[in-house]
Amino acid sequence: MLNTPRICVVVIGKTLEEFLSQLEAAQTAVDFVELRIDYLEQINPNWVRIIKNHTHKKAILCCRARADGGKFLGTPEAQQEILQAGNDLGFDYLDIDLPVANKISIHEKKAKIIISYHNFLHTPPITELNFLLENMRLFNPDVFKFATKSEQYEDVKTLFKLLINKKNNENMIVLGMGEQGKIIRLLSPLLGGYLTFSSINGAISAPGQIDFKTMQDFYQRFYKISSPLKGED
């Protein structure tokens, strides 16, 4: 049985004003947002509080370092301070990258934790992805996330294999970056993926990210043609 897709719109404004404007637009479209505060030109825990006060839907707080494909240039200690503030303020999810997961410890955890792996160069073989998954399990996250550059059919197969073979009690996000990866972004939430990400008003945070309206139209058409016809054999 196919799952109902959960779509999360990414917010990436550079100034606080632009960020809040994007957040408002995103919240009129979906019930789930990812707040990429590493895109802000300046950031401090007080801004995290202001953003939280304007957040009315389920939200993932993400402060991704430049080394992991994000924009944040601060230290892991600064990341910890920002994410801890997000936890204390009541954000639903915190996204922590696997390379820094052993350096960031959230105290009195309230938020759900997403452990992420990003590879902007290629999709590793399934054996390597499974090894990374075992490393992620050491942190006992609520959600596992894999996003890799997908340039050919074999990359798509590898990511689908990772998703389909996950444990039944595990939540996993699997994304392909690039043109070939778009099919994974569309189909993974139908096949057991926890959610998929989309953009709004052209604010794209990753290669191959699909506009929310385009994604919504796809799912509407998909369910229309896949629904069983009553009264017919």
Swiss-Prot record:
Catalytic activity entry: 3-dehydroquinate = 3-dehydroshikimate + H2O
Enzyme class: lyase
Enzyme nomenclature, EC number: 4.2.1.10
UniProt keywords, alphabetically: Amino-acid biosynthesis, Aromatic amino acid biosynthesis, Lyase, Schiff base
Binding site for 3-dehydroquinate: 34-36, 64, 185, 205, 209
Catalytic residues in the record: 118 (proton donor/acceptor), 145 (schiff-base intermediate with substrate)
SUPFAM superfamilies reported for this sequence: Aldolase
Cystines in this chain: none
GO molecular function, one term: 3-dehydroquinate dehydratase activity
Keyword Hydrolase: no
GO terms (BP aspect): 3,4-dihydroxybenzoate biosynthetic process; amino acid biosynthetic process; aromatic amino acid family biosynthetic process; chorismate biosynthetic process
Keyword Lyase carried by entry: yes
InterPro entries according to UniProt: Aldolase_TIM, DHquinase_I, Type-I_3-dehydroquinase
Pathway: Metabolic intermediate biosynthesis; chorismate biosynthesis; chorismate from D-erythrose 4-phosphate and phosphoenolpyruvate: step 3/7
Entry superkingdom: Bacteria
PANTHER family listed in its UniProt record: 3-DEHYDROQUINATE DEHYDRATASE (PTHR43699:SF1)
Subunit structure comment from the entry: Homodimer.
Task of the protein: Involved in the third step of the chorismate pathway, which leads to the biosynthesis of aromatic amino acids. Catalyzes the cis-dehydration of 3-dehydroquinate (DHQ) and introduces the first double bond of the aromatic ring to yield 3-dehydroshikimate.
Matching HAMAP family: AroD
Family note: Belongs to the type-I 3-dehydroquinase family.
The protein's name in its UniProt record: 3-dehydroquinate dehydratase
Species for this entry: Coxiella burnetii (strain RSA 493 / Nine Mile phase I)
Organismal lineage: Bacteria, Pseudomonadati, Pseudomonadota, Gammaproteobacteria, Legionellales
